[in-house]
Amino acid sequence: MTRVALTSAVNLAKKLQEAGIRHPAVLKAISRTPRELFLDNALAHKAYENTALPIGQGQTISQPYIVARMTELLLQHQPQKVLEVGTGSGYQAAILAQLVPELCTIERIKGLQIQARQRLKRLDLHNVSFKYGDGWQGWPNRSPFDGIMVTAAAAKVPEALLSQLAEGGVLIIPVGEETQQLMRFTRRSDRFSSEVIETVKFVPLINGELA
């Protein structure tokens, strides 16, 4: 990580702290992660702006505030094993991999998955398992998970993901179509409590279609 990138990442973390992010480990991970690595060169100059940016294939790299907020919500439950649905650029995975012992991540667009794997390897993050597949179905063979994070908006909550939560596990997911709400579901035996966190805007979670 260059000195300029490090300074920019540290400044981004400070902006996120001012915006309400409080978890010190999340802020530290943001400050150590070169976001420009996850963007095309043409957009690298925008890497440390607090905004979502296109990454091709109709997908985006999420706004840093949302990355930090979702991570903070997940870490409140101290997960040991996490599933990320929607690897995308790999930036969210890079943040999570610094904060949890084991991360599994699924992507339905092969080209994005290949790029993300290469980027995390460059950052020496080796506690991540990758899967090319339909995120709606989760990763049954690797379940249960203490935490599941979905980085695209589902029209409804996928039952498969709820079923793959461990006891006490949490699902962080944007739900809705035109109007989306970031929600947290917590498993208690065979029951699930739900909590609306805030209004958000994500690309849609596509069901069953690989690219």
UniProtKB/Swiss-Prot annotation:
Single GO MF annotation: protein-L-isoaspartate (D-aspartate) O-methyltransferase activity
Domain of life (superkingdom): Bacteria
EC numbers: 2.1.1.77
One Gene Ontology cellular component annotation held by this UniProt entry: cytoplasm
Localisation per UniProt entry: Cytoplasm
Record Gene3D superfamilies: Vaccinia Virus protein VP39 (3.40.50.150)
GO BP: any one term: protein modification process
Keywords assigned: Cytoplasm, Methyltransferase, S-adenosyl-L-methionine, Transferase
Record-linked CDD domains: AdoMet_MTases
Family matches, as SUPFAM superfamilies: S-adenosyl-L-methionine-dependent methyltransferases (SSF53335)
Pfam families: PCMT
Active-site residues, Swiss-Prot/TrEMBL: S62
Reactions listed under catalytic activity: [protein]-L-isoaspartate + S-adenosyl-L-methionine = [protein]-L-isoaspartate alpha-methyl ester + S-adenosyl-L-homocysteine
Function: Catalyzes the methyl esterification of L-isoaspartyl residues in peptides and proteins that result from spontaneous decomposition of normal L-aspartyl and L-asparaginyl residues. It plays a role in the repair and/or degradation of damaged proteins.
Family annotation (PANTHER family): PROTEIN-L-ISOASPARTATE O-METHYLTRANSFERASE (PTHR11579), PROTEIN-L-ISOASPARTATE(D-ASPARTATE) O-METHYLTRANSFERASE (PTHR11579:SF0)
Family: Belongs to the methyltransferase superfamily. L-isoaspartyl/D-aspartyl protein methyltransferase family.
Protein name: Protein-L-isoaspartate O-methyltransferase
Gene it is expressed from: pcm
